[in-house]
């Protein structure tokens, strides 16, 4: 399993390439082959122009792109995305959602988000977690948005589903 958390977990003292191939660095398996693979992944996430930069010179969106490349480097069948886009501006968020969807399309992905629109854009099935009450499940019923993700938010049925999700969230607060 690979994990892309809300806050990047990059190491500021490592190069961008070594952050991507962190597992290989930690276990002493770093090689010319893994370095090349890291460079290819950084190119896929649009970071090849920034290889010379230090961690401190990267924007929040750039750090998340590097973190996404590290997730891809792990080549896990299951990927947990834990609020990975929440700290980004609207444009970076949209671009990274699309990029992550494209690069992870052949993986099983569990997306944790507090953003109903994000869930509706990217998910095949949506569950709402809530504090369980006696004789009640912690999971809501499944919501299945129509169409292929990533979806455009101008679809009428998505607005209705967004309201349904908000109602589920409100119900869980009571």
Regions found by a protein language model. Give the residues of each.
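Conserved signature/switch motifs of ABC ATPase nucleotide-binding domains
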Residues: 53, 74
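Hydrophobic anchor residue at the start of the ABC signature
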Residues: 4, 68
